[in-house]
Amino acid sequence: MEIKLGNNKLKIFDNKKQKINYKLRAVKSDYTLSYEKKLTMDKYMDGRETVDLISIRDNNKIIGEFFLNSNDEMIFIYDVYLLKLIRVSNDVVFENDDNEEKEDEFNNYYDFSEGVMIGLKTPREENDDGTYSIEKYRTLWVSYNNYKLGYIYAKDNIIFPRLTGIWNLSVYQDSSNGFNSDEFQVSLYDENDKKEKSIKDENTTNIYKSILFVGNDYIAIKEYIGNEFKGNYPIYKILPVSNVNIDNGLQINEVFNESEKIKYINELKNKINSLSIEEKEGLNIENIDYNNIAIKRELGKWRFVSKILPKNMNEEGEEVNLDILPDKRFINYNLMYISWKDLKNELGIFKDVFISPLYKIALIQFNEYISIYKIEDGNIIAEPLEMIPINENEEVVMAEWCSGKYVEQWEKVFIDGEVILDNNY
């Protein structure tokens, strides 16, 4: 791979930028290089109080940063990539691309459309009498064609795609003997009304379940089992959609390959070693449950998480964010073309971001809105195309994208739902 930096030009990953400029500033050890990698400048200070950091700007927006470790070695940050580069030449030549104008013309007229199902969860809350509400779920449908947004719909429950069609996931609470038990109901969407609830034994304890992630073939949940619920869920599970109410989730050998398993165990041990004596006292570190695994959102991606179980199962336990991403078995699309840091510099404080596979729009979650932004030349256009109102405590548990002919097919499921926003923008 070759990267070229000129006085006003840049070429990286076959991407070309014209009329760029540079800005130099001195940064200290606490300067964040990458939120995704949890990396600050501290690693590269080498005894220095400050390091000269050079920002690459395009249309007054930072598109990359770099600093020199030596005369011939550079650390280069571009989008979500952090690269160590070695100088190969001081002479930079940019070849003329005769097809550049034709490619731009093609991109301007290329017909593209995408759609996304966004699954939202309203977590249970404590009522005035000390009881807890039931969690609620709904699915948003957002689509566009050449940046023209279609109707934005909402329907109850989690509506999600599988190879066999569009499916419906709902949660109901079974109450008997004074105990509550959350159960999932999964069916093909058009068979939803015909599906009967599963027959189970009478409840002998409370079981509360909360969805963290929904994919095509698996969901991830957190769970509480007991009679003194305080809003804590110490148990994590990954469950197959085909048998979603089983007692045990996927085991460690079913989730990770051998190298990932070693990495996971090491990260868990490192987490334990970083805890104070007081923190360790409340955890069951003598008998680690390595199968206590889930998937949830962090920094714009779906990631594996684990939890060290507490000795008192009414408590929360200690969460461990793993540096391992789910493979295609769990999620088809899990990329983030724009770094969290760049978005933070551009938009300030936000909760989450979902960038379309065609890299044309971004859905940014704020406290009370999911704002839809257009993407041009790798940059988010500051004025949103539209803002979808959501509740402040709603959490995203699913984002399933489609393009082309599937947009119309998926939308058919939603056209009898609630119209959140029409297309008169």
Model regions and ranges:
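Tryptophan-anchored aromatic micro-motifs
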Residues: 1, 104-106, 113-116
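Contiguous, well-ordered beta-strand patches that form the walls/edges
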Residues: 5-66, 192
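Short coil/turn segments that connect the beta-strands within blades of beta-propeller domains
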Residues: 71-72, 113-115, 215-217, 358-360
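Hydrophilic extracytoplasmic domains
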Residues: 318-425
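Repeated scaffold domains used in trafficking and secretory/extracellular systems
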Residues: 63-64, 155-168, 199-212, 259-265, ...
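Edge beta-strand at a domain terminus
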Residues: 19-31, 71, 75-101
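Acidic, serine/threonine- and glycine-rich low-complexity intrinsically disordered segments
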Residues: 199-349
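Short, solvent-exposed loop/hinge segments that bridge or flank secondary-structure elements
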Residues: 1-9, 56, 126-142
